[in-house]
Amino acid sequence: MTKYVFVTGGVVSSLGKGIASASLAALLESRGLRVTLLKLDPYINVDPGTMSPFQHGEVFVTDDGAETDLDLGHYERFSSARMSKRNNFTTGQIYKSVIDKERRGDYLGGTVQVIPHITDEIKLSIREGAKGADVALVEIGGTVGDIESLPFLEAIRQMGFEDGPANTCFIHLTLLPYIPTAGELKTKPTQHSVKELREIGIQPDILLCRADREIPLDERRKIALFTNVRPEAVIEVLDADSIYKIPAMLHEQMLDEIVCHKLNILARAADLSVWKRLVDALEHPEHTVNIAFVGKYVDLTESYKSLSEAMIHAGMHTKSRVKIHYVDSEQIEKSGVDCLRGMDAILVPGGFGKRGVEGKIAAIRYARENRVPYLGICLGMQLAVVEFARDVAGMADAQSTEFDPTTNHPVIGLITEWLDRTGQVEKRSEQSDLGGTMRLGGQPCTLKNGTLAREIYGADSIVERHRHRYEVNNTLLSELEAKGLVVAGRAPGTELCEMVELPPAVHPWFVGCQFHPEFTSNPRNGHPLFISFVRAALAHQQKDSA
């Protein structure tokens, strides 16, 4: 029988429930338990796929093509569990499912209500997502007290009652703000947050208290007294300069032991040797590299969360501190590329819409002409093809039809047909809905022998995750290849272009990929593409300093 750990948050949002859940998952996994994680989001969108990055941050894509919350990226990076569409659901999905059932007549003419129909659907989704795990960690998005979260909180309250205290554990994450004028941490917000939770019918078993300084023992005892939580289960979570230090911080306060005891689980001692090695690599780099991220969502770096984490992982595996410089592509359009001088490498990530595109193309041109290592991801690959077509192949008006439908040289166009991960044919048109209609999830790619891509991956065939609706136009690709562009990877069956590069005689490291390799990078193994990219940046740095 699967046991459940429910993680809620109080006082303010963005306290780090996702990191806390992922860190606990890492601890339980190190004790030999099979773990999975679920994220319940209270917004009414069916998924975050059409939400602005400024509103939601990154959209994390799973192997099965689900567009999900960025916390699922943390789950995969901290544990060996692979996420799927069963691991993230929203109020929109729950209500849509219930309404569809009502329209089919599944409720036999009954009045459909929040309780029991919505809460039953939530419980069903949780149990489906938790199948096969010893422990399922379920994170409830939002903050206790939000009206949107109430059906989710009621559902987990019912699960606590149905499954019993030996099979459920409730963790509440709160904030202890420091008031400079008083010179002390304040516990009252935590007390009121727990009071609100208890009014709903949930008594937390463990409190994780965020603070920017050590919480005095007397204050912890006070919190325990007023919240009805055991003193040893009032755990401080101090601000850390790296999220990868959190598992050890929680383990030192015996969080995993407290959870196992609450759930009546006999498990081996935790082995954190891998995490200690990773933190040591993070804290003792031998080099520093400067990499420019040229994008349009740089004011909210959460939009590139998996990318920035993938660069940190690559740094761990190359003994390097990777210093990311976020560059607004619109600023390049206004002021030129001088801001890129001195960079050891340039990366252009994915994105949507015309704003800032010419600035990205200017950055790509700078990287190509100055032999600066370049990695283009998704739109970053497409724009590398556009830049090559314009400045090398002589197609002066080359563009993507996403930005100029009337161009005479549409080197990038809408994908109208492709094979999904199950081999079924998917078709799209300009009139298709925006939500859930992209080429999504894990897709195979065959690499060309003798290419840099083949050398980097060390394999003839790979599977990477995708999220796009535009692709390189095969009808013009032969002209670009004749001018020196190398197609390093193609999708079998459809021959869609998946990777491009420049020959080593022209450029030491210039690679574009249509997929998103950042979604499969983790601190334990890194990702070969990012590791090679950082090594190329180091080589460029050493060449410049010679």
From Swiss-Prot:
Binding-site list for CTP: S13, D146, I147, E148, K186, T187, K188, P189, T190, Q191, K222
Recorded metabolic or biological pathway in which this protein acts: Pyrimidine metabolism; CTP biosynthesis via de novo pathway; CTP from UDP: step 2/2
InterPro entries recorded: Class_I_gatase-like (IPR029062), CTP_synthase (IPR004468), CTP_synthase_N (IPR017456), GATASE (IPR017926), GATase1_CTP_Synthase (IPR033828), P-loop_NTPase (IPR027417)
Residues binding ATP: S14, L15, G16, K17, G18, I19, D71
Protein residues bound to UTP: S13, K186, T187, K188, P189, T190, Q191, K222
Binding site for Mg(2+): D71, E139
Activity control, per UniProt: Allosterically activated by GTP, when glutamine is the substrate; GTP has no effect on the reaction when ammonia is the substrate. The allosteric effector GTP functions by stabilizing the protein conformation that binds the tetrahedral intermediate(s) formed during glutamine hydrolysis. Inhibited by the product CTP, via allosteric rather than competitive inhibition.
GO molecular function, one term: glutaminase activity
Annotated positions binding L-glutamine: G351, L379, G380, M381, Q382, E402, R469
EC number: 6.3.4.2
Keywords noted in UniProt: ATP-binding, Glutamine amidotransferase, Ligase, Magnesium, Metal-binding, Nucleotide-binding, Pyrimidine biosynthesis
Subunit text: Homotetramer.
Other known facts: CTPSs have evolved a hybrid strategy for distinguishing between UTP and CTP. The overlapping regions of the product feedback inhibitory and substrate sites recognize a common feature in both compounds, the triphosphate moiety. To differentiate isosteric substrate and product pyrimidine rings, an additional pocket far from the expected kinase/ligase catalytic site, specifically recognizes the cytosine and ribose portions of the product inhibitor.
Task of the protein: Catalyzes the ATP-dependent amination of UTP to CTP with either L-glutamine or ammonia as the source of nitrogen. Regulates intracellular CTP levels through interactions with the four ribonucleotide triphosphates.
Name of the molecule in the record: CTP synthase
Organism: Thiobacillus denitrificans (strain ATCC 25259 / T1)
